[in-house]
């Protein structure tokens, strides 16, 4: 299984990062949202988008990448972690994939906005009542 999230390998962390928690790096002004905290490997999986409080700097309004050995702090849990300063570190994940970190940071394993839509089915709208419950199933294959 490949991920479309950025990753930070941390050392000397305190606390546990929660999913959907905003993380910041004060020195750089980087902002992101935690997707998953892998406590066994000390890896923060996160995303950044070009929306306020989700990936853009409140000062510049631009997307700022996490970088350097600056402390990363969780907004709600106050958990902290310092990125590993090693040049290249490879971590083998539970599924067998290997994630290579450069100075504590790893890019997504898949490229965003790449790929092809192989099937679209257009249907007419169906009227629903406001108290009706629906099950939605989505199949995604890579």
Residue spans for each PLM region:
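Interface-prone segments of viral and bacterial extracellular assemblies
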Residues: 1-142
């Amino acid at each position: 299984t490949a991920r479309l999230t950025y990753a930070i390998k941390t050392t000397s962390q305190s606390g546990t990062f929660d999913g959907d928690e905003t993380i910041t790096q004060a020195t750089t002004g980087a902002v992101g949202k935690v997707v998953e905290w892998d406590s066994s490997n000390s890896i923060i999986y996160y995303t950044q988008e070009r929306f306020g409080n989700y990936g853009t700097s409140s000062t510049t309004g631009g997307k700022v990448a996490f970088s350097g050995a600056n402390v990363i702090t969780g907004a709600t849990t106050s958990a902290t972690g310092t990125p590993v300063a090693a040049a290249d570190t490879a971590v083998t994940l539970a599924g067998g994939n290997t994630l290579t970190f450069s100075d504590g940071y790893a890019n997504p394993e898949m490229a965003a906005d790449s790929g092809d839509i192989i099937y679209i089915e257009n249907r007419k709208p169906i009227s629903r009542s406001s108290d009706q419950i629906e099950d939605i199933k989505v199949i995604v294959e890579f």
